[in-house]
């Protein structure tokens, strides 16, 4: 039976039940896939950090590694080593380029070259 207009007045028709009115079975269980809200009430996935680690990418790394101060001499040695490695890479690259060029432009081809007059 429908209620009269006076009884329905002021009450929304599709109002969800309050939490205390619901039976215990309807309350969702917090388990497997439900993200836990953080202290501010915003889920960690909404923050953009699904793993729940430190918010700043380098924050945990800074705590784990000791602070290392380099001497100017040690920095110069590192730069010298990088320059040496770059020169070695340059030499090897040039070597392979020359080998490739020689193979493509050699006169002893496995097949005869026909020139048209």
Swiss-Prot record:
Biological role: May be involved in transcriptional regulation.
Top-level taxon of origin: Eukaryota
Source lineage: Eukaryota, Metazoa, Chordata, Craniata, Vertebrata
Organism encoding this protein: Homo sapiens (Human)
Spans annotated as Disordered: 1-75
Protein name, UniProt field: Transcription elongation factor A protein-like 8
Family stated for the protein in its record: Belongs to the TFS-II family. TFA subfamily.
Subcellular location, record wording: Nucleus
Ranges in a coiled coil: 73-100
């Amino acid at each position: 039976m429908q209620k009269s207009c006076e009884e329905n007045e002021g009450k929304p028709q599709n109002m969800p039940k309050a939490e205390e009115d619901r039976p215990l079975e309807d309350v969702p269980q917090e388990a497997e896939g439900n993200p836990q809200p953080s202290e501010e009430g915003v889920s960690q996935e909404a923050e953009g950090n699904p793993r729940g680690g430190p918010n700043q990418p380098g924050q945990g790394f800074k705590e784990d590694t000791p602070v290392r101060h380099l001497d100017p001499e040690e920095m110069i040695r590192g730069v010298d080593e990088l320059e040496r490695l770059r020169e070695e890479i340059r030499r090897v690259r040039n070597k392979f380029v020359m080998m490739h060029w020689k193979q493509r432009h050699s006169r002893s081809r496995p097949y005869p070259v026909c020139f048209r007059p």
